[in-house]
Amino acid sequence: MKTQVMTFRISNSFEEWAKHFDSHLEIQKAAGMMPLFRGPHEDDPQKVCIVIQISDDAKADAFMQEHEADILESGHILETTEVNKYL
């Protein structure tokens, strides 16, 4: 299992983004993704960090591709995403 740390910017409030993110928890879990943390940067509420445990990289990548429209709708600015994976 890997731990993935993602940071990115959002185009709306953290509360709006978080509500959207949380509404997809069941399908994230079905894709082998277990969110551990989500929060805004202390000095910039439009910069977000999420930490997720991933059981299968291929399933996680497929989830991101399949749900790209939903991710964009949440306010996530995809081109600002930085991803780091840890063993």
Model-identified regions with their sequence ranges:
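Short S/T/G/P-rich N-terminal loop/turn motif that feeds into the first structured element of a domain
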Residues: 1-71, 79-87
